[in-house]
Structures are given as C-alpha cells and as structure tokens.
C-alpha cells in the first residue's frame, strides 16, 4: 500500500525523509499528514528524527539501505552520534568526504545495487560498495547525472523519470534485475526521489500525486496486498 503525505505543505516528502527496509529517518516537525509515515513504519522498523548539518533535507543529503547509511561531511559529530545510537546496531553509519554533498541526489540504491553520479569520487564509490554492500554502477537517468533525484529503486522494482530513453531503460533494467517503469509523481513531476519514499513493503508519495500515478507506484513496487490484486484482476476481466 502507498499513502499520500506532505511535509509542511510540501509534496516533496522524499526531500525530508529517508526510508529503507531497516530504518526510517524523518525531519523534525511536520503536520499530521507527515506523522502518518512514522505511524505506518514504526511498528516494524525504528523511525528517527534527525538533521544533517542543521538542515532538515535528510533525503537529499543522505543515502542508505538495510546495511548502512552514508552522510555528507556537513553532518556534525553530534548528529552522527545521534544516528549511530538510534539506528539498529548492524547498520553501519559513516560520514563521507565527497565534494558532491547531496548524496541522496547523486546515488540511488536498493540492498544489492547502486546507481551513482558518473563523476562521483572513486574513493566514495569504494565506500558505497563497502558500507552499503552493493555493486556500484556509474550511470545517468534520462541523461541527468542526478540518479537519486530521477529514479527510485527497491529490491522489488524501480521507477525512472519519463524522459528516460528505451536504451537507458534496457541498460538500467539489466543492471538492477528488477521490473522498472518510467513514470511521475505529484501530478506529472519527474523529480521521483523528491516526491516519494518506498521500501519493500510500504510507500509514501506527495499529496499532489494522482490516483493513476499512485496505482503505478503500488504496481511497480509490489505494494498492493493480495485483496487489492484479486480485485484488480476481477475488474480487468469485467472490462
């Protein structure tokens, strides 16, 4: 199931949140429509409030999966310690000396593979492979190097910006080995990483997301429960 949410009247919930299969990090504050994220995920995984370098744009600055969390060098010692103490013990939390500090914009990953900005530092690439335990591939999405902004990847599926060419889709599909689709959120926005957060069992999209967009998100990431799938199958047969 995927739900709509917003952060202080912003539909760009992915800017302020980081969701993995092992933990969720949210920005301080937010209205009741943002707190729904914590309500949904906290029974299964820890949900932690945090800032990075005093900023609330967690999703843009950090990248992680069930094995680790990478933070930019703007993250101060107190924030680093807070996250290390709050996340599960087997999640490695590490600061990265990368000149492109918006790691969340430059990296898209699941628990096995990472797509990264083609110009990311070689040392950073090695840290990504080591801490997150993934294979790393330098790639663009729709000709844009900000792969974390223009794609969202889980272990079950991936969505790419709509201007992604067929060749790019085939290349990325071969790399990821999961079903993928080109799509939008928030009523036609191609800023997928900004507009949604997804793991293997739940997802959240910006409040402006249409019913059609929401349905595609639920389908590609396999977020529908069995009853929903059966109902959809019946409706398809009735057409």
UniProtKB/Swiss-Prot annotation:
Main location per the UniProt record: cytoplasm
Keyword Protein biosynthesis: yes
CC annotations in GO: cytoplasm; nucleolus
Pfam families, sorted: eIF-6
Gene Ontology molecular functions: ribosomal large subunit binding; translation initiation factor activity
Alphabetical keyword list: Cytoplasm, Initiation factor, Nucleus, Protein biosynthesis, Ribosome biogenesis
Location within or outside the cell: Cytoplasm; Nucleus, Nucleolus
UniProt-listed GO biological process terms: cytosolic ribosome assembly; ribosomal large subunit biogenesis
Top-level taxon of origin: Eukaryota
PANTHER family named in the record: TRANSLATION INITIATION FACTOR 6
Subunit structure: Monomer. Associates with the 60S ribosomal subunit.
Role of this protein: Binds to the 60S ribosomal subunit and prevents its association with the 40S ribosomal subunit to form the 80S initiation complex in the cytoplasm. May also be involved in ribosome biogenesis.
Family: Belongs to the eIF-6 family.
Protein name: Eukaryotic translation initiation factor 6
Taxonomic source organism: Entamoeba dispar (strain ATCC PRA-260 / SAW760)
Gene: EIF6
């Amino acid at each position: 199931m995927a739900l709509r949410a917003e952060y202080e009247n912003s539909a760009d919930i992915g800017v302020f949140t980081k969701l993995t299969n092992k933990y969720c990090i949210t920005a301080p504050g937010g209205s009741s429509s943002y707190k729904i994220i914590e309500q949904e995920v906290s029974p299964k995984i820890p949900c932690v409030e945090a800032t990075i370098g005093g900023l609330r744009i967690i999703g843009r600055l950090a990248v992680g999966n069930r094995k680790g969390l990478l933070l930019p060098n703007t993250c101060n010692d107190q924030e680093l310690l807070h996250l290390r103490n709050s996340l599960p013990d087997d999640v490695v939390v590490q600061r990265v000396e990368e000149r492109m500090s918006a790691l969340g914009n430059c990296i898209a990953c699941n628990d096995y593979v990472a797509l990264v900005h083609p110009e990311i530092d070689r040392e950073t690439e090695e840290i990504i492979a080591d801490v997150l335990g993934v294979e790393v591939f330098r790639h663009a999405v729709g000709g844009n190097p900000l792969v974390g902004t223009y794609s969202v990847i889980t272990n079950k599926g991936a969505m790419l910006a709509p201007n992604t060419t067929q060749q790019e889709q085939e290349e990325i599909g071969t790399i990821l080995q999961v079903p993928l689709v080109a799509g939008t959120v928030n009523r036609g926005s191609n800023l997928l990483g900004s507009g949604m957060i997804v793991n293997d069992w739940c997802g959240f999209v910006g409040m402006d997301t249409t019913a059609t967009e929401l349905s595609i998100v639920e389908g590609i990431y396999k977020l529908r429960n069995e009853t929903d799938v059966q109902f959809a199958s019946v409706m398809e047969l009735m057409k």
